[in-house]
Curated annotation (Swiss-Prot):
GO CC, alphabetical: Atg1/ULK1 kinase complex; phagophore assembly site membrane
Cross-referenced InterPro entries: ATG11, Atg11_C, ATG17-like_dom
Organism: Aspergillus oryzae (strain ATCC 42149 / RIB 40) (Yellow koji mold)
Protein name per Swiss-Prot or TrEMBL: Autophagy-related protein 11
Positions of disulphide bridges: none
Taxon lineage: Eukaryota, Fungi, Dikarya, Ascomycota, Pezizomycotina
Function noted in UniProt: Selective autophagy-specific protein required for pexophagy and mitophagy. In contrast to its Saccharomyces cerevisiae ATG11 ortholog, is not involved in non-selective autophagy nor in cytoplasm to vacuole transport (Cvt).
Length: 1201
C-alpha cells in the first residue's frame, strides 16, 4: 500500500514538473521566434541597402574612371588643341565665360576658343574634387561592409533551444507506476497460503531491485531536465536582450548610411571645363559641317525657286497663247474680255544669320589634320560619318526618287518638283549600287544552292527530308542590262501606302507624347507618395525605437522575477535532494536484509526471463523476415511492371529520337560544311555537333589567345627593355664602385704596412725598456742603496712602460680593425663581380627570351591571317586602315578602277628581318628596330579580327537555327501528311505502307494485276493464294514490299532459264523470277509489289467493281500491235537510242533499294508527288502529236487498269 501511494505521488510530481518544462520551452520558443522575426526584418533592410549601394557604387566607379581618364589626358589634349588650326570667325563657339581675344589674324587654333587660366584652374581643382568623391565612396563602402558583417554575425550566432525528450521519461514513469498498481491489485486478489506468500515475496523483491530504483532514476532525470529548461530559458532571455540591442544599433547605423547614399552626388564645374577640352575638336568640326550644310541648303533653295519660277512662267505663257487663240476663234460667238493668266511669285523668307563661308576642302583638311594627332580617333570617326551624311539624300528625296514604285502619275508629277537632276542621279546611283550588291549576294547564294542540289542529286537520299523544294527557280546569272533597267524602273516608283503610313506615324507620335505626359504626371505623383511614405517611415521608426525601449524595460523586470524564482527553486531542489538521500539509505537497509534469502530465486527468475526474451526476439525476427519477404515480393512485382512501362516509353522515345536525328543530321552537315569548307563531315551526329562546337570554340579561343599573346608580348618586351637598361646602368655603377673600392683597398694596405712597421719599432723599444727595468729590479733586489733619483727613474721607466703597453694595445687594435676592413672589401669586390656576371647572364637571357617572344608573335600573326583566309576572309587596306572582308566582297570592290586605287589586298605578316631587333650594335639602332617591329604588329588589329570571327560564328548559328526550324516544319508537315494519307488510297509515288487499289489488266493471257495510278504505271502485284484474285474484280491492299526491276531481253536471249517459277507463282503461268514476266519492252523499269489485304471480304460478284473498272477499260484503248512505218531504219535507230538512253540513265543503273533507303525516301514523297503533278499537267497541256511515238508505245503501257 505504501509503495503504491509513493509511486502515485511521485508520478503526480513528475507530471507537474513536465508541465513546467513545457511552459518554459514554449516561452523559449516564443523568444527565439521573436528574435528570428527581428533578424529577418534586419536582413531585408540590409539586403535593400546592399542593392542600393551596389547600384550607387557602379555609377560612382564609372564616374571615377571617366574622371581619371579626363585628369590623365586633359593636359595632352589641351596641348594638342594648340597645334590644330582653326578659324576665328565663329563668335558663338566656346563657353560663355571664354574671353574673346581681339586679333587681326583670321586663323588661329582651337585653344583660342578656351580660357587657358580657367582650364588650368579647373585641372587643379578637379584632382581634389575627384579624390574627395573617391574617399566619400570608400567611407560608404566600409560602413556598408561593417553593417553586413555585423548582421551576418548576428544571424550565425546560435540561439538556445528548448529541452526535448521529456515525454518519453514521463511515459516511462507512468508505465512503472501502473505496473506497481497492477501488482498491488494482483496481490490483493491472491489467497492467503504459503505458496502465495512466496510469490508475493519474490514480487516485492523484484519491485525493490528493479522498479523502484528505475522510478527514482527517471524522476531524477526529469528534475534535471527542468533545471536545464530553466537555464536555457534564462540564456534565451539574455541572448534576446543582446540581439535586440545590437539590432537597434545596426538599424541606426543603417539609417545613417542610407542618408549618405542618398546624398552621394557629384556636381563640379571643373570637370565640365575639362570635358569641354575633350569635346572641342568634335564641336568645331560639327560647326564646319553645319556651315557647309546650311550654305548648300540656301543655294539649293535659291536655285530651286528660280527653276520653279521659270517653269511656271513657261506654263503661264503657253496658257496665255492658248487663250488668245481660243478667243480669236470664238470671238464672234463669245463676248468676254481677255483676262490675264494667273501666275505665281516665289519669294524667299526667313533669312537667318549669315554663317561664315566654309568649303568642303576645309572640312577634309581639318579631318586629315585630326588624323595626324594622337588620341583623336573617335572625333575623326564621328566627323567622317557626319561628312558622309552631307551627300546622303533626305527622307523626302529618297521617297521621291522611287516615284514609280507602286505609285501613280500624281506621285511622279509631285516628285518632279523641287528635285534636281543631280539629286535624282545621285539617288538612282545609290539605289543601283545597293541593288547590285543585293544581286551579287543573291547570285552567290543561288550558285551555292545549285551546287548543293547537284551534289544531293548524286549522293544518297538525305536522312531528313528533301531540301530541293526550297531552292529558288530564278536564273543563276541574270542579264545585267535587264537588271539595271528593272532597278531604274523600280527606283522611280513610289509606294501608295506612304501617306497612310505617315499618318499612322503622326498619330503614333501624338499618342506617345500623351503617354509621356501621363507618365511624367505619374512619376511626379509617385515622388510625392514616396516623400510622404519616407516621412511616415521615419515616424514609424521612432515609434519602433520607443517600443524597443519599453520591451527592454519589460525584459529587465522579467529577468529580476526569473532570478527570484530560480533562487526559490534552488532551495526546493536542495530539500528534495536531502529527502531522496534519506529514502535511498532506507532502501539500502531493506535490500541488505532480504538479499541473502532471495538470491537463488532471483537467479532462476533471471534465467527464465532471459529465455523468454530470447523466444520473443526469435519470434519477432521470423515475423519481420516474413513481412520483409512479402514486401520485397510486392516491390519486385511493382518494379517489373514499372520497368515494362518504362521500356515501352523508351522504345517510343528511341524511335522518335532516331527520327529527329535523321532530320537534324542533314542540317548539321550543312552547318559543318559552311564552317569548315575543306574538312570532311563526320559520320554520326554527336561527332558533327562536337566538331561544330570545337570549330566555333577554336575560333573564339584562337582570337582571344592571339589578342592576349600580343598584349603580353608587347608588355613583356617593354618590361625586358626597361630591365635591360636598368641592368646596364647597375653594371656601370658596379664597375665604378669596384674601381673606387680597389683604390681604397690599396690605400688601406699601405696604411697597414706602415702600422706594422710602427708596431715593430714599438715592440723593440718595449723590449729595451723591459731589459732596463729588469736590470734595475735586480739591482734593487741585490741590496744596492737606492736614492731618490733612482726611485724617480724607476717610476719614470714604469710610466714609460705603461704608455708603451697602451700604445701597443692601440696599434694592435687598429691592425685588427684594418685587417677586418680588408676582408670586408675583398668580400664586396667578389660580390660585385658575381653580381656583374649575373647581370650579364640576365641580359643575355632577356635577349634570348625577347627573340623567342618576337618569333612567337610573328607565328601567331601568320596563323591568324591563315585562319582568316581559310574562313573566306581577305585583309584589305582602305584609307590606311585594315579592314577584314569576305573574298566575294573584295572581288566586287576591285571591279572598278576607282576601288582599285583606293583599296587593295595586303598582307599583315611582319617583316622577318625585324625579328633580330635585339642584336643591334647601338641602343639607338635597337630602339628603331624595336619600334619598326611594333609598328608592323600594330598593323593587324585584333579587335577587327575578333569582330569578323564572332560575326561569322553568329551567321552560322543563325543559319543553323533557320535550317533547324525549317527541318522541324518539314517534319511536322510530313507527319501531318503521312497521318492524313495513311487511310487514303495512293495513286502515285507508291511506297511501303501505302494503301493501293489493284485492278486486273486487259492482258487476259497472263492475268496480271496492277495498281490503280495516275502517271505512275508499271506497278504490278505479286499474286498470292490468300488474295484469291480469280474470284475478285478489285483488291484493296496495303503495300508491304516493293521490288524495282529493269527489263533486259538480252539475258533471256542468251540462254537464261525462262521456265523458273517463284514460290508464290500464279495459276495462270506468270513467273516472277523471269526477266520479263509481263511481256514489257526492253530497258523499261517496273515494280513488283507485295501487298496484304486491308479489308478482307471483298465482293466476289459483279457489283461496284464493274463501275470501278469501267473507266479503266475506256481509258486504256489502244492497239497492242506495232504500227509499221515505211522508214524501218528510222524505227530501229529510234528504238536503239531509246534503249541506250534507258540503260545509261542514272535511275536504271541503281540497284533495288534497300528497306532503309525506302524508309528514308518516305520524306521525299511530297516533293516527288509535286513533281509528278507538274509533269502530268505539262504532258496534259501538250497536243497529242507531242506524245511518244508508236514505236515506243508498247503493250506494257496498255496493260494498266
Amino acid at each position: 500500500m505504501a509503495r503504491r501511494t509513493w509511486a502515485e505521488g511521485l508520478t503526480e510530481r513528475c507530471e507537474l514538473i513536465h508541465k513546467d518544462i513545457q511552459e518554459r520551452n514554449e516561452r523559449t520558443d516564443i523568444i527565439n521566434r521573436a528574435i528570428s522575426v527581428a533578424l529577418e526584418n534586419l536582413k531585408t533592410h540590409v539586403g535593400t541597402l546592399e542593392h542600393r549601394f551596389t547600384e550607387a557604387q557602379t555609377w560612382a566607379n564609372d564616374l571615377l574612371k571617366e574622371q581619371h581618364v579626363a585628369l590623365d589626358g586633359w593636359e595632352r589634349t589641351f596641348a594638342t588643341l594648340g597645334n590644330i588650326p582653326a578659324r576665328k570667325d565663329f563668335p558663338f563657339l566656346g563657353r560663355p565665360s571664354t574671353p574673346t581675344k581681339g586679333s587681326d589674324n583670321s586663323t588661329g587654333t582651337l585653344r583660342d576658343y578656351l580660357d587657358t587660366d580657367e582650364v588650368h584652374r579647373a585641372g587643379s581643382e578637379a584632382v581634389d574634387v575627384s579624390s574627395r568623391f573617391a574617399r566619400q565612396v570608400e567611407d560608404v563602402e566600409k560602413a556598408v561592409g561593417g553593417i553586413a558583417a555585423d548582421t551576418q554575425h548576428l544571424v550565425d550566432a546560435a540561439v538556445p533551444a528548448g529541452v526535448d525528450g521529456v515525454e518519453g521519461l514521463l511515459q516511462e514513469v507512468e508505465t512503472i507506476s501502473r505496473k506497481i498498481q497492477s501488482d498491488y491489485e494482483h496481490v490483493l486478489a491472491l489467497p492467503n497460503n504459503q505458496k502465495t506468500l512466496a510469490n508475493i515475496s519474490r514480487l516485492a523483491l523484484s519491485h525493490t531491485k528493479d522498479l523502484l530504483p528505475s522510478l527514482l532514476e527517471v524522476s531524477a532525470e526529469i528534475q534535471t531536465n527542468l533545471e536545464e529548461a530553466a537555464r536555457q530559458y534564462n540564456a534565451a532571455v539574455k541572448a534576446a536582450f543582446n540581439h535586440m540591442r545590437q539590432i537597434s544599433l545596426i538599424e541606426s547605423r543603417l539609417a545613417d548610411v542610407q542618408s549618405q547614399i542618398n546624398n552621394l552626388n557629384f556636381q563640379s564645374d571643373a570637370f565640365d571645363v575639362l570635358y569641354t577640352v575633350f569635346h572641342m575638336p568634335f564641336v568645331y568640326g560639327s560647326i564646319l559641317i553645319e556651315s557647309v550644310r546650311r550654305r548648300e541648303f540656301s543655294d539649293k533653295m535659291k536655285s530651286d525657286s528660280l527653276t520653279l519660277a521659270e517653269e511656271m512662267s513657261v506654263f503661264q505663257d503657253e496658257e496665255q497663247r492658248r487663250r488668245k487663240k481660243w478667243i480669236k476663234n470664238m470671238g464672234d460667238f463669245v463676248s468676254m474680255s481677255d483676262t490675264t493668266t494667273p501666275g505665281i511669285e516665289v519669294n524667299l523668307r526667313g533669312q537667318e544669320y549669315e554663317w561664315p563661308v566654309v568649303s568642303r576642302k576645309e572640312i577634309e583638311a581639318y579631318i586629315e589634320e585630326l588624323k595626324t594627332k594622337p588620341g583623336m580617333a573617335s572625333p575623326v570617326q564621328e566627323l567622317t560619318q557626319l561628312y558622309k551624311e552631307l551627300d546622303a539624300p533626305t527622307r523626302l528625296q529618297r521617297r521621291r526618287a522611287k516615284a514609280f514604285k507602286q505609285g501613280s502619275v500624281f506621285d511622279l508629277s509631285r516628285s518632279s518638283l523641287l528635285l534636281r537632276s543631280d539629286d535624282m542621279v545621285r539617288s538612282l546611283r545609290d539605289e543601283k549600287s545597293k541593288l547590285e550588291e543585293k544581286v551579287k549576294g543573291s547570285e552567290s547564294r543561288i550558285r551555292k544552292l545549285e551546287d548543293l542540289l547537284h551534289r544531293q542529286s548524286h549522293m544518297g537520299r538525305p536522312a531528313s527530308g528533301n531540301f530541293s523544294i526550297d531552292f529558288p527557280s530564278s536564273p543563276a546569272s541574270p542579264h545585267p542590262d535587264t537588271l539595271s533597267r528593272r532597278s531604274s524602273v523600280s527606283s522611280r516608283r513610289m509606294s501608295s501606302n506612304q501617306s497612310s503610313e505617315e499618318k499612322a506615324l503622326v498619330q503614333r507620335i501624338v499618342h506617345l507624347e500623351a503617354e509621356l505626359a501621363a507618365e511624367r504626371e505619374t512619376v511626379q505623383k509617385l515622388q510625392k507618395d514616396a516623400h510622404a511614405e519616407r516621412q511616415s517611415n521615419t515616424d514609424k521608426i521612432q515609434e519602433v525605437q520607443s517600443t524597443k525601449n519599453d520591451l527592454i524595460g519589460n525584459l529587465e523586470a522579467r529577468q529580476r522575477e526569473f532570478d527570484d524564482e530560480r533562487r526559490f527553486l534552488e532551495g526546493e531542489m536542495k530539500k528534495c535532494r536531502i529527502r531522496a538521500e534519506e529514502l535511498e539509505e532506507e532502501l539500502d537497509r531493506i535490500m541488505e536484509s532480504r538479499e541473502h534469502e532471495k538470491q537463488d530465486a532471483d537467479e532462476r527468475i533471471h534465467q527464465l526471463e532471459l529465455e523468454l526474451q530470447d523466444a520473443h526476439a526469435r519470434a519477432e525476427e521470423e515475423i519481420q523476415k516474413a513481412t520483409d519477404l512479402t514486401a520485397y515480393t510486392q516491390t519486385l512485382k511493382d518494379a517489373e511492371e514499372s520497368l515494362r512501362i518504362r521500356i515501352e516509353e523508351l522504345e517510343k522515345q528511341e524511335s522518335e529520337r532516331r527520327e529527329r536525328e535523321r532530320e537534324s543530321n542533314q542540317a548539321l552537315q550543312a552547318a559543318f560544311m559552311n564552317l569548315s569548307p575543306g574538312g570532311s563531315v563526320p559520320v554520326d551526329t554527336p561527332s558533327i555537333v562536337k566538331a561544330i562546337e570545337v570549330l566555333s570554340e577554336g575560333l573564339s579561343i584562337h582570337a582571344k589567345n592571339a589578342e592576349e599573346s600580343s598584349a603580353k608580348a608587347v608588355a613583356e618586351s617593354k618590361e625586358l627593355g626597361e630591365r635591360l637598361s636598368q641592368l646596364e646602368s647597375e653594371a656601370e655603377e658596379l664597375r665604378k664602385t669596384s674601381e673606387m673600392r680597389a683604390s681604397e683597398l690599396s690605400l688601406v694596405k699601405e696604411e697597414l704596412a706602415q702600422e706594422k712597421t710602427r708596431l715593430e719599432n714599438v715592440a723593440s723599444d718595449l723590449d729595451d725598456e723591459r731589459s732596463k727595468f729588469i736590470a734595475l729590479q735586480s739591482k734593487l733586489a741585490s741590496g744596492e742603496t737606492g736614492s731618490d733619483a733612482l726611485q724617480e727613474r724607476v717610476i719614470e721607466e714604469e710610466r714609460k712602460l705603461a704608455d708603451l703597453s697602451q700604445r701597443l694595445n692601440e696599434v694592435e687594435a687598429q691592425a685588427r680593425k684594418a685587417e677586418g676592413e680588408v676582408l670586408v672589401w675583398k668580400e664586396r669586390v667578389e660580390a660585385m663581380a658575381e653580381t656583374e656576371q649575373h647581370a650579364a647572364g640576365r641580359v643575355e637571357t632577356c635577349g634570348t627570351r625577347s627573340q623567342e617572344l618576337s618569333k612567337q608573335l610573328f607565328r601567331q600573326v601568320e596563323k591568324v591571317e591563315h585562319m582568316l583566309e581559310q574562313l573566306g576572309f581577305t585583309v584589305v587596306r582602305q584609307n590606311g586602315d585594315i579592314v577584314v572582308q569576305r573574298s566575294s566582297k573584295v572581288t566586287a570592290l576591285s571591279s572598278t578602277a576607282e576601288s582599285l586605287s583606293q583599296s587593295g589586298v595586303v598582307s599583315v605578316r611582319p617583316d622577318p628581318t625585324l625579328l633580330d631587333w635585339m642584336h643591334a650594335d647601338t641602343s639607338q639602332e635597337e630602339t628603331d628596330r624595336f619600334m619598326a617591329f611594333m609598328e608592323s604588329l600594330y598593323q593587324f588589329d585584333v579587335d577587327i579580327f575578333s569582330d569578323a570571327i564572332v560575326k561569322r560564328v553568329k551567321d552560322i548559328e543563325v543559319l543553323a537555327r533557320k535550317w533547324q526550324k525549317e527541318a522541324r516544319g518539314y517534319r511536322d508537315k510530313y507527319h501531318r501528311t503521312q497521318s492524313e494519307a495513311h487511310d487514303k488510297i495512293a495513286y502515285r509515288s507508291f511506297k511501303e505502307g501505302d494503301l493501293a487499289l489493284f485492278l486486273p489488266t486487259r492482258n487476259q493471257a497472263i492475268r496480271s494485276w496492277a495498281a490503280f495510278n495516275v502517271g505512275a504505271p508499271h506497278y504490278f502485284l505479286r499474286e498470292q493464294d490468300v488474295h484469291k484474285l480469280h474470284t475478285r474484280d478489285w483488291l484493296l491492299a496495303r503495300i508491304t514490299k516493293i521490288e524495282e526491276r529493269v527489263v533486259d531481253l538480252s539475258k533471256s536471249m542468251n540462254g537464261a532459264n525462262p521456265d523458273r517459277r517463284s514460290i508464290g507463282e500464279a495459276s495462270d503461268g506468270t513467273s516472277f523470277d523471269d526477266e520479263n514476266p509481263f511481256e514489257l519492252s526492253d530497258g523499261l523499269r517496273w515494280y513488283l509489289l507485295d501487298a496484304m489485304e486491308e479489308k478482307p471480304g471483298a465482293p466476289a460478284t459483279p457489283g461496284l467493281g464493274k463501275s470501278t473498272v469501267a473507266p479503266a477499260h475506256v481509258d486504256a484503248r489502244g492497239s497492242i500491235r506495232l504500227k509499221r512505218t515505211s522508214a524501218g531504219g528510222n524505227v530501229a535507230r529510234t528504238l536503239s537510242k531509246s534503249l541506250d538512253s534507258r540503260r545509261n540513265s542514272s535511275n536504271s543503273k541503281k540497284g533495288p533499294a534497300t528497306p532503309s533507303q525506302r524508309g528514308n525516301d518516305s520524306t521525299t514523297d511530297l516533293a516527288r508527288q509535286a513533281d509528278a503533278d507538274s509533269t502530268t499537267a505539262t504532258a496534259g497541256s501538250q497536243p497529242r502529236e507531242a506524245a511518244p511515238t508508236s514505236e515506243e508505245v508498247r503493250r506494257d503501257q496498255l496493260q494498266g487498269p
